[in-house]
Swiss-Prot record:
GO terms for molecular function: metal ion binding; metalloendopeptidase activity; serine-type endopeptidase activity. Residues 227-274 are annotated as: Disordered. It is an enzyme of class 3 (hydrolase). Keywords: Disulfide bond, Hydrolase, Metal-binding, Metalloprotease, Periplasm, Protease, Signal, Zinc. The gene is mepA. Its EC number is 3.4.24.-. Belongs to the peptidase M74 family. This is Penicillin-insensitive murein endopeptidase. GO terms for cellular component: outer membrane-bounded periplasmic space. Zn(2+) 1 binds at H110, H113, D120, H211. Zn(2+) 2 binds at D147, H150. Disulfide bonds join C44-C265, C187-C235, C216-C223. Its cofactor is Zn(2+). Binds 2 Zn(2+) ions per subunit. Zn(2+) ion 1 is bound in the active site. Zn(2+) ion 2 is bound at the dimer interface by residues from both subunits.
Length: 274
């Protein structure tokens, strides 16, 4: 499938959830032992943790949207990564969307982030902590050139390279989505230590943030993991294909309705949403 068709599918997956979803009516995590259920784009979570808003190592953006819930493994990953970044004096980690209290489908902006195992992290590491006003209305820093073929040299910093590499080296991380131009720059900067690049995957948009995804927890028996990324650093023909013009004759895919929920997620909705 060519890149234009994939882009249209991604857009449809996101726009299909623009209408309000019942998951928004669940305002607190569902009690129980932590269980990620279903797939990243069609699932839910029981026993989600709340990411502490106050931390000396990170700051949480858009707290008014209450998207700072996730599996305990995700909370621990954020704390672990931000502590590493702080110890290296790289700056403050800026945390974007995680998931809703019970996971589930958003009303827009995300097709995934449904099982408590995804988090968006800004590709900025401010040395001075942001104000409350800045956090509520964050200004994204677009690192990619207008033509989408490379990063903006004056905006690309070694600290951002280190942030992405640290995240990719974490044992619980399976994928990190970034813009193809950012992946390309990582490939150029990586040197001989390249194993971690396998986890960094080019994807549409993602010009100012990285989307980090964790593996399914071992005790979440209903969680559906993705296949591992292809072997290698992903810096060859696959990456270059993202910069090729779309093939002629690309047709817009039919709009698809969301798939049925996993039975456990449907039961959760039936119990907690009137």
């Amino acid at each position: 499938m060519n890149k234009t068709a994939i882009a249209l599918l991604a857009l449809l997956a996101s726009s299909a959830s623009l209408a309000a979803t019942p998951w928004q009516k669940i305002t607190q995590p569902v009690p129980g032992s932590a269980q990620s259920i279903g797939s990243f784009s069609n699932g839910c979570i029981v026993g989600a943790d709340t990411l502490p808003i106050q931390s000396e190592h990170y700051q949480v953006m858009r707290t008014d949207q209450r998207r700072y819930f996730g599996h305990p493994d995700l909370v621990m990953f954020i704390q672990r990564l931000s502590s590493q970044v702080s110890n290296l004096s790289l700056g403050t980690v800026l945390i974007g969307d995680m998931g809703m209290p019970a996971g589930g489908r958003f009303n827009g902006g995300h097709a995934s982030h449904q099982t408590g195992l995804d988090v968006d992290i800004f590709l900025q590491l401010p040395k001075t902590r942001w104000t409350s006003a800045q956090l509520l209305r964050p200004q994204a820093l677009d690192l990619v050139s207008r033509d989408g073929k490379h990063v903006v040299p004056t905006l690309w910093k070694p600290e951002i390279f280190s942030l992405i590499k640290l995240a990719a080296q974490d044992k619980d991380v399976t994928r990190i989505f970034v813009n193809p131009a950012i992946k390309q720059q990582l490939c150029l900067d990586a040197g001989t230590d390249r194993d971690w690049l396998r986890k960094v995957r080019p994807w549409f948009q993602h010009r100012a943030h990285m989307h980090v995804r964790l593996r399914c927890p071992a005790d979440s028996l209903e969680c559906e993991d993705q296949p591992l990324p292809p072997p290698g650093d992903g810096c060859g023909a696959e990456l270059q294909s993202w910069f090729e013009p779309p093939k002629p004759g690309t047709t817009k895919p039919e709009k698809k309705t969301p798939p049925p929920l996993p039975p456990s997620c449907q039961a959760l909705l039936d119990e907690h949403v009137i």
